[in-house]
Amino acid sequence: MNKKIAVKILLYLLSLSVYTASVAQVAQLDNLAIVTGAQTLSNGEKAAIKILTEEIEKRTGLHCTSSATFPATGNVIIIKKSGDKLKTSFAFDNLKNLILKPESFRIAVNNDKSRTIILIEGTDSRGVFFGAGKLLRLFSYSKKSVSIPVSLSLSTSPDKPIRGHQLGFRNTANSYDAWTPEQFDQYIRELAIFGSNSIESIPIFDEKQSPHFKIAPDEMNKRISEICQDYDLDYWMWVPAQLDLNDKDKRNRYLSTFEKICGYSARINGVFFPGGDPGNNPPELVIPLLEEMAVILKKYHPKAFIWLSLQNFDAAQSQFVYRYIREKMPIWLGGLVVGPSSPPAAETRAALPRKYQLRQYPDLTHNVRCDSPVPWWDPAFNFTLGREAINPEPNYFAAIYHALDQYIDGFISYSDGIHDDVNKITWTELSWNRNENIGDITREYSNFFFGKAVTDDAADGILALEKNWEGPIAANGSIQSTLVLWQSLEKNHPELASNWRWQMCLLRANYDAYVRKRYIYETGLEEQANIILAAADTVGADKAMAQALEILNRAETDKISPALREKIISLCEALYQSIGLQTSVAKYKASGEERGAVMDFIDRPLNNRWWLEDEFKRIKLLPEKEQASALKSIGNWENPGPGGFYDNVGNISKSSHVLKGQSWMVKPLQVDDEGPGFDWWDNGFSRKRLSWMINMRWPPGVEYTGLDSTAQYTVRVTGYGECLLKANDQRLSPSKYGKGVGEIKEFPVPKSLIHNGKLLLTWDDLNEDFLNWRQQSRVNEVWLIKNL
């Protein structure tokens, strides 16, 4: 990352969560009429009236009338496009200039004797709609009234022309597949109120039908296109080709399906074809397909464009696409899309002619095994919350947004459920105004969805949930403080009990606290068991195993914080009922354990109990004289002995010697600073030692100081595959070289390499691009053992 971007991000981060409240006179409005400036209204203007009347009445019980006639009395909201004339002599004295860009608007509030007049004026019908959305976010809501600062005046325009989210009605989703058309309408409306102008569906998919579908996928996708038409939003489709394009029959069926979708869709503005993820066809086959798709698309939707991502294309394939675009300048192409496993945005923007736009496809939905994993996430959260848990991370995703801002013309996010709702709103608001403060964004979110009584505290609570995931879980005492805050909010605001966004925050606060308590408790149990195992030659092997198991099983027989556990189960049920969130495969028919099934992992051991149980079965089959030795080895697994050190390299709680690279605040994209990885074995229920599922490809370095320069040291490593280890920049030769999971490698360190008691371990890189990432080499644990 260049210095300009780094400085920009740092300056931005300094302002995060900073909020300055200005004291302003507020108008309390208990009657409202909406007046239109045009006799014939566009879809955007009709939608503006609809969202104002319905959302105000929903929150307050106050009904707004609407007409084209300016009333003689009462409070008024004027909605008009620039150039529309109103039959009124009222003039605003505090109007800011309207920015003459698409979707721009201005809002002003003035008092006229005993009434308040609010103006929403847009450069176009979308500007009117987004102005209405902004006003709804600015209102404070009370019973039968709304309030607004009397001197309010603003004028604004969007930074990015593309601002949207993918909402796929498919089995893979953790909630969308359970929705009715009315729920899609409401959620799309809410995204639009915060500035989204695009919605992307997934009408072609190769997976089983969801048990939650209320209507057929074709019918739902048709309805989503109609909803976009009603709100005057762009409608996009994500249409991967999960087939071999050399197969003419399959190719023709794909094109036939695509034409059917084009025919039934009320509108289509963009068609996004991913080069890969999923799909595995070279661009030489993809581009001719896109040319045919463009002909079909233009027949039904003449103003629509095709978009292509280079996901999973290698360097030569990407260059093929760049060259094709430069030479052919296809008129059917809207631009390229940058997503997971794509070339960097900077490269693609530089290679793409300026007439074509570059759209980002950010993954806002996943926590691990993704493009933007939670930085140095404590493994206790990985093993329980997993890949698709509720994940408000406004600060982190704001930093990512700012790192990409200069390259992109907008975004439509990847999302597979409502669990990433805060992240969606964050990116939407930043794409409207890159300088928007995170504190203000979370306050608007809280005010609109929870109400003015909790605006400040709930906004703080959302930011606190993000802080819960920072650093070692045991040392993060703020997790308990976050729980106390949300428990207080829940107690004092029972009226929000059925609000699904509220329920999500409560679930995360309770789940985080429960995981922390379990981790501390179960870690202590394992430490007690290890003491007994380390003394197996004194205690006796059978007795040591029996005593260790009794201690370890207290996690089940004497559960910690059972009330918290029951609360989590209760909130999971509430979320299934309120919004269809599927937190369990067995109970709620989630499509898979990796898809947000957090309830299924509520009791997953956070110590090595399962591994120890299996090891005891193995050890009991050994000759009696070998059993005690094997148990001692297990009991001392993480004990490097006097003068030694142990690190589980990807575990933030057990990696004090591991160099962590630059903070996400400086380098949010984590390019070249690959963080920890978490292997997904046996659908999350692997009984292997936990440290073997926590890895780094190659740690940036493992650094030791204060060593005995006269002593002989040995480096011990577990991991998988190869290990090209260097000590103080000199390659070490192994004396033991186990390549399997959990197998030991050992490297003697020549005394001459330890200078001034310092030792830095690093790894030479190894090109394994020909292997699936699951088969690539990696490091799990590193010991530095002082040979006595």
Predicted regions and their residues:
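Feature activates predominantly on carbohydrate-active enzymes
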Residues: 42, 48-51, 55-57, 95-251, ...
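Beta-strand-rich ligand-recognition modules
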Residues: 691-710, 718-787
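Structural motif
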Residues: 36-40, 78-84, 121-123, 169, ...
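Composition- and surface-driven signal marking solvent-exposed, interaction-prone regions
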Residues: 2-4, 48-49, 134, 179, ...
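Acidic, contiguous N-terminal accessory segments
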Residues: 4-6, 11-15, 21-113, 145-153
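Glycan-recognition and processing domains
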Residues: 625-707, 772-788
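Catalytic-core regions of glycoside hydrolase
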Residues: 142-144, 197, 209-225, 229-230, ...
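C-terminal non-catalytic alpha-helical accessory regions
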Residues: 415-423, 435-637
